[in-house]
Amino acid sequence: MRKHFLLSFVMMAFAFISCSANNTGSEGSSPVSDKKADNKMTQVKLETTLGDIIVELYNETPQHRDNFIKLVKEGYYDGVLFHRVIKDFMIQTGDGNSKTAGPETMLGDGDPGYTIEAEFVYPKYFHKRGALAAARTGDQVNPERRSSGSQFYIVTGKIYSSEELNMMAKRMTDIKKQDIFRRLVTENRAKIEELQRNQDNAGIQALQNELIQITEAEAAKTPSSMTDEQIDAYTSVGGTPHLDGQYTVFGEVIKGMDVVDKIQNTQTGAADRPTTDIKIIKASILN
């Protein structure tokens, strides 16, 4: 990263070092399930009021896979609404409270009472059109990016040009470096406060330069440039590349994207909830 990019962020981070970070992330752990003995991927049918959607669950995300299978077998998803629908972005469901929700009820907080550890298999699995991913709370209250125990979304997204993807990759790199630097500042909080108390400007400058160098080196280990597969998908079928590496992608739609499109094109009202309820009538394991 060029030094001038970080300067304003660096000075702000040092100036507000005395402010406490909010790290009250979601607690709880997911239920333990048996792992599949073979490499065959589980398929799940979602019978909705607008048609059937069939998804396939990735074996490389075993906690999410096993939890999804568990909830399907328990009937947790039977009757839940697609409570958040944004055209050219995604359709979201899995809020257990939505089964009996009235038309004015605000939804999005319902879950089984636990979260799931993030399972990022990136860049192999990314937010292409049709991707199945776990919803979660934001980074400020969930720095570990743990997934909701039940809520998930299916990506619809949009098609991007190569130029747009290049610009997005640069922004993602900048955000990553800011996150790294913020963590380093927190880790060096005591040292920074001591330098500030002693009014050691030279020491502060030296530490700032050191943290910038560490940030550069750490960010370089995981470049934000997209793979050929990502570029091909995002420039042909589309998706939501800005979510990559931030939310767990644990499966994909293998049949029924026409139904997904029907859902994403429905009229919505407050909080992006469809004005006419669209629900999962029944979820079932196919194999």
PLM regions: where:
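Positively charged n-region of N-terminal signal peptides that target proteins for export
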Residues: 1-4
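Sec-dependent N-terminal signal peptides
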Residues: 6-12
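Cyclophilin-like peptidyl-prolyl cis-trans isomerases
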Residues: 7, 19-287
